[in-house]
Amino acid sequence: MAAPALRPLILICDDELPLRELIKAVLGDGYRYVEAEDVGQAEEALEESKPEAIVLDVMLPGKSGLEFLSELRAKRRKKPIPVVVVSAWQSADDQRTALDAGADAFVGKPFDPKDLASVVEALIAA
């Protein structure tokens, strides 16, 4: 296992604590984590840390995850952070909307743990 300081840092932004805990359990000990319950906390986490990837819920209190993602992409054009959007809304239109907003990947809830883990791993390795 990599030394703690060398493990990639992932920002998990979801308003539900049990889901944040599940995502950490699914992704495992190979990563470090910073958590946010809403967009404001996610913005603070981005200022204070340098995550290698973001796992982002769509439905958040206040500003939506997709609004945050669109703003993030507009601000960070030179070195974008890979973003995986997770959402219970899974229609083709919902997925297209997330990808159009700047998501690198979309994983529907409930998700297969292997799917989420492989998507995050691939985005960090890219």
Language model: regions and residue ranges:
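Two-component/phosphorelay signaling modules centered on CheY-like receiver
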Residues: 17-34
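Acidic, metal-coordinating helix/loop segments flanking the phosphotransfer/catalytic sites
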Residues: 35-53
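Conserved Asp/Asn-Gly motif in the active-site loop of CheY-like receiver
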Residues: 36-40, 95, 113
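Acidic catalytic/metal-coordinating carboxylates
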Residues: 38, 64-70
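The feature encodes the CheY-like receiver
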Residues: 61, 91, 110
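Alpha4 helix (beta4-alpha4-beta5 surface) of REC/receiver domains from two-component response regulators
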Residues: 67, 90-107, 118
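C-terminal output helix
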Residues: 111-120
